């Protein structure tokens, strides 16, 4: 059966190296590695098996970084903890176990354990001792050492809102501003990778390439229905458009209702999530904004002379979001 969440993006990170740092009791042959190689076939994904002892693991990763000079490092769970320490690279940390020693104790990771994925050395089982836990507690004391403003700009943390294993959002956010909650659990699946991790990889790639995409302004009123839910196909359309265009949500700024801004932000986090993080514009004068397109149910006369192309959602040409998708499919990325 075809996986509805997986598709390929040959141009994404094309010709670049991505270092993937796996989680606890995993290996470089995890499903996430296969997923990344499938989705980004022109990128080289490097995924070493990590030694059990943390100092050996971070030493290995630093050697790999020195040899391979990856364009991006992605680390999950325990791998996110190591990723934080790899200074000087663009990095994405997914549900990072920044207090790994404490996590091992609180989630019954002591004693005999089994690797969840095959390893190149053939080892299948291992034992977590108190001494090993102490090693992990010691290594995590080096998280956040020597961070400067440049490092803060190069790191993004993604935190599943259903993660019951690790909760380090607040700890991460005290050091890095780009802390984003996504819809998902601790273990990354196809849906969370495609809808949450991949948009961030796209931002990194665009930044590295200094790539400018056509800008689509999306009126908040075009996304929300009369019941406060997402309009039909609005979520699908937003995610699809974000693969090619630079999208911003435009919401009304009401001077006498400051709480409304928080309500809009929470709605966007719930229904659009990661692709719209940091991309909400609050204004009472959207006609003054610069963009190539504006998707808005308002009539032309209400916009006061928007300089781009106005797509009026709900009129005879664009009755639904599906018709908006068809329009942009025909444009081919223009």
Predicted regions: what they are:
Residues 74-84:
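Gly/Ala-rich beta-loop-alpha elbow adjacent to hydrolase catalytic centers
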Residues 5-67:
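Active-site catalytic motif of lipid deacylating hydrolases and related acyltransferases
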Residues 71-75, 91-93, 155-161, 281, ...:
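Short, hydrophobic beta-strand segments that form beta-sheet elements in well-ordered domains
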Residues 90-204:
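The alpha/beta-hydrolase serine catalytic core
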Residues 224-248:
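Short, acidic loop-to-helix structural element flanking the phosphoryl-transfer center
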Residues 23-27, 51-52, 187, 224, ...:
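Short histidine/acidic/glycine/proline-rich micro-motifs that form metal-
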């Amino acid at each position: 059966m075809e996986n509805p969440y997986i598709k390929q993006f040959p141009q994404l990170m094309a010709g670049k190296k991505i270092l993937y740092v796996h989680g606890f009791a995993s290996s470089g042959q995890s499903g996430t590695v296969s997923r990344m190689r499938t989705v980004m076939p022109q990128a080289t994904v490097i995924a070493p098996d990590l030694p059990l002892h943390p100092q050996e693991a971070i030493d290995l990763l630093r050697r790999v970084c020195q040899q391979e000079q990856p364009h991006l490092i992605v680390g999950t769970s325990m791998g996110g903890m190591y990723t934080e320490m790899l200074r000087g690279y663009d990095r994405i940390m997914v549900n990072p176990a920044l207090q790994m020693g404490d996590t091992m104790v609180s989630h019954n990771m002591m004693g005999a354990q089994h690797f969840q994925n095959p390893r190149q050395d053939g080892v299948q089982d291992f034992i977590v001792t108190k001494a090993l836990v102490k090693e992990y507690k010691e290594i995590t004391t080096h998280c956040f050492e020597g961070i400067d403003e440049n490092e803060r700009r190069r790191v993004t943390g993604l935190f599943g809102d259903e993660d019951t294993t690790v909760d380090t959002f607040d700890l991460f956010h005290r050091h890095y501003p780009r802390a984003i909650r996504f819809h998902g659990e601790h273990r990354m699946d196809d849906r969370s990778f495609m809808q949450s991790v991949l948009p961030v990889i796209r931002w990194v790639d665009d930044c590295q390439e200094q790539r400018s995409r056509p800008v689509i302004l999306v009126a908040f009123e075009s996304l929300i229905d009369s019941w406060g839910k997402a309009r039909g196909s609005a979520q699908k359309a937003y995610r699809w458009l974000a693969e090619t265009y630079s999208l911003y949500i435009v919401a009304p700024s009401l001077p006498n209702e400051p709480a409304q801004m928080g309500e809009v932000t929470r709605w966007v986090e719930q229904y659009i999530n990661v692709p719209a993080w940091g991309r909400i514009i609050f204004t009472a004068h959207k006609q003054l904004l610069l963009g190539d397109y504006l998707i808005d149910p308002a009539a032309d006369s209400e916009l006061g002379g928007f300089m781009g192309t106005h797509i009026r959602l709900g009129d005879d040409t664009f009755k639904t979001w599906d018709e908006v998708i068809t329009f942009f499919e025909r444009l081919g990325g223009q």
